[in-house]
Curated annotation (Swiss-Prot):
Coiled coil (UniProt feature): none
GO term, biological process aspect, one: regulation of cell shape
UniProt EC number: 3.6.1.27
Record's function text: Catalyzes the dephosphorylation of undecaprenyl diphosphate (UPP). Confers resistance to bacitracin.
Other known facts: Bacitracin is thought to be involved in the inhibition of peptidoglycan synthesis by sequestering undecaprenyl diphosphate, thereby reducing the pool of lipid carrier available.
Cell wall biogenesis/degradation found in the keyword field: yes
PANTHER family referenced in this protein's UniProt entry, alphabetically: UNDECAPRENYL-DIPHOSPHATASE
GO MF annotations in UniProt: undecaprenyl-diphosphatase activity
Protein name: Undecaprenyl-diphosphatase
Subcellular location: Cell membrane
Organism: Staphylococcus saprophyticus subsp. saprophyticus (strain ATCC 15305 / DSM 20229 / NCIMB 8711 / NCTC 7292 / S-41)
Catalyses which reaction(s): di-trans,octa-cis-undecaprenyl diphosphate + H2O = di-trans,octa-cis-undecaprenyl phosphate + phosphate + H(+)
InterPro entries xrefs: UppP
Length: 291
């Protein structure tokens, strides 16, 4: 594999790491950077390029798992948390616990099992991604405006099971390509009277198991498309996504309490305009599908 192609793999890993957990839609950015510019499918083949995107997404997922490892250890009662007082479901009282995460995962898990192939076949196109980007941006703006009326927002350890389920429903809705899982769930958390940082924490903590299961299953189904001659491309992309993902998640969690969601929403609208100009004005990206 040529050096230029390896550099492209690193670039795509960086883009994935920057955007997977930010409320800006990693799908929209992959369309812009890969499908419209770098075009990994031209030197990997369409199925191998699709598999590569699964691999770099896993890099971002592992970054999220690392950032929130202490929370997972606490919920699973592992390590230094194994001797702490627990309640009836194996967790400390009045804390975010494993049942919150399970309840939040149910909607996306069920819909993913039932409709993932349908979504990939019928909803994954440039116009539908642009629709998801735009509607998601409006939802984020609405959430930010509403948050100004909340006088005593909840933190992540005050969330109840009903709120966890509702946020999980919004994660399921975000299966529409371009809508953005984090944009949808953070906005819903804010509408459920959580502060922005806590809504982001819960979003990421809940998203990692869902994404790990979904990406892991997809990778198993597509392992045959990973060729040893391309292994360097996959490894560099994965590492880039993991390292950049670590930095991006920590930076986002610092920024979200200060700038809220509207700046990200405006960015999404600008992204829609750029993609629309390239797609409708210049015909770039015509025929893009999920696989």
């Amino acid at each position: 594999m040529l050096i230029l192609e390896l550099i492209k793999g690193i670039i795509l890993g960086i883009v994935e790491g920057l955007t997977e957990f930010a409320p800006v839609s990693s799908t929209g950015h992959m369309i812009l950077v890969d499908d419209m510019w770098l075009k990994s499918s031209e030197f990997l083949g369409s199925q191998s390029a699709f598999t590569f995107k699964i691999v770099i997404q896993l890099g971002s997922v592992f970054a999220g798992a690392w950032v929130f490892r202490e929370r997972y250890f606490e919920m699973l009662h592992i390590g230094k948390y194994r001797h702490e007082p627990i309640d009836g479901i194996g967790q400390k009282p009045k804390r975010l616990n494993l049942l919150h995460i399970i309840v939040g995962m149910i909607p996306a898990g069920v819909l993913g099992l039932l409709f993932d192939d349908v979504i990939q076949e019928y909803l994954f196109s440039v116009p539908t991604v642009m629709i998801g980007l735009f509607i998601g941006a409006i939802y984020m703006i609405i959430a930010d405006i509403y948050s100004k009326k909340v006088t005593n927002p909840r933190n992540v350890d005050q969330i109840n099971y009903f709120q966890a389920f509702v946020i999980g429903l919004s994660q399921a809705i975000a299966m529409w390509p371009g809508f953005s899982r984090s944009g949808s769930t953070i906005s819903t958390g804010v509408l459920m009277k959580m502060n922005h940082k806590s809504a982001s924490d819960f979003t990421f903590i809940m998203a990692v198991p869902v994404m790990l299961a979904a990406s892991g299953l997809s990778l198993v189904k597509n392992m045959e498309y990973i060729h040893m001659s391309d292994i360097g491309f996959y490894v560099l992309g994965f590492l880039a996504a993991f390292i950049v993902g670590l930095i991006a998640i920590k930076t986002f969690l610092y920024l979200i309490s200060k700038i809220k969601l509207i700046p990200f929403a405006i960015y999404r609208i600008v992204l829609v305009i750029i993609i629309a100009i390239l797609y409708f004005g210049f015909g770039i990206g015509q025929g893009i599908t999920g696989e």
